[in-house]
């Protein structure tokens, strides 16, 4: 299992477009991916749950990845937030 903390840097937070792209990215991996913030958790492959987190700019997301391709999933998710979470 891997765990990574990522700060939301988008001024609009994790709104519909980047959340949808994140969920699509999570679907590319067989690993289980859980995203949590402020005591709430969401399955990374479920758009409704991810949006319900209400992650705003400055919030820290804890992302837990567990499965056979967890290293690749971790790298892809870090890259997503570094380059394209807008």
Question: What name fits each language-model region?
Answer:
Residues 14-34, 41-59, 73-75:
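Amphipathic alpha-helical interaction surfaces in cytosolic regulatory modules
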Residues 1-10:
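Short amphipathic
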Residues 7, 36, 64-66:
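Solvent-exposed beta-strand sheet faces enriched in polar/charged residues
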Residues 52-86:
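C-terminal structural segments of small proteins and small subunits
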């Amino acid at each position: 299992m891997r765990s990574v903390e990522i700060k939301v840097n988008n001024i609009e937070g994790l709104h519909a477009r980047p959340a949808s792209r994140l969920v699509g990215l999570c679907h590319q991996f067989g690993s289980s991916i859980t995203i949590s913030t402020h005591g709430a958790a969401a399955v990374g492959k479920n758009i409704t749950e991810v949006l319900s987190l209400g992650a705003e700019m400055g919030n820290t997301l804890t992302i837990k990845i567990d499965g056979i391709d967890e290293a690749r999933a971790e790298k892809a998710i870090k890259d997503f937030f570094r380059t394209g979470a807008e």
